[in-house]
Amino acid sequence: MPQFNLMDARLKLERAREHILDVERAVENLTAPELYKISIQRDESPYLSVDFETLHDGNQYLSAIIGDAIGNLRSSLDYLMGGVVKPLGGNPAKVTFPFADNEKGFKGEVRAAPLLLTPDLVDVFDKIEAYEGGAGRNLWAINKLRNIDKHRLLITVNHLAGIKASWRAGSSTFTNCGMWVEAGKQGKAIRAPAADFEFTSYPTPMFQIMFDEPKVPPFTEVGPFLHLAASDIDSLLQSLEKV
């Protein structure tokens, strides 16, 4: 089996990882103290209340950065495919990474004439299962998200802002408890008898973004998903580099 030059695919993957770090830095900036109002007070009864308000506006910039990361992840797969078919006599400019919506369709794509895959390589790619419900479902989702991002910004409406704190209330202890609201909203985090209440760590801001696209499972957090997809691509590159 020929050796494959996958350096271009690796460069695209590294560029995608830089964009993923950009996403994480942008999210970290959204935990700036000036974007949160946290109040700790007693109400009319002998209770202590912790309320918070978030001052975030809608942020399409985040969706644009996420789209950049997804675009480079997707491109790295096409570059990978080009590196595989070139020594087999194929034309890298005329092939794309195989995807399908089910197992039958995926196996058909793997065996498509333009790829010129040898039987051994067919076995390798069959195991990738880049289809909905397959082992490579993250790669399948990246492909679907990339197709969406080519026409509009990805929807990450689920911007959640919150606070995290630890406290004792009577004989009960609560550690690193998070309370979330939709970004730009306000909410009540804690209400407890004041006489028996003590913070062990004071409230600190948090921020989280999740996909709101039908091709990604509900409540999928953006950062971890992108890292996982990048790791899947890296593992695939490693396996082909060892062939």
Where are these regions (language model features)?
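Acidic, Ser/Thr/Gly/Pro-rich intrinsically disordered interaction regions
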Residues: 1-243
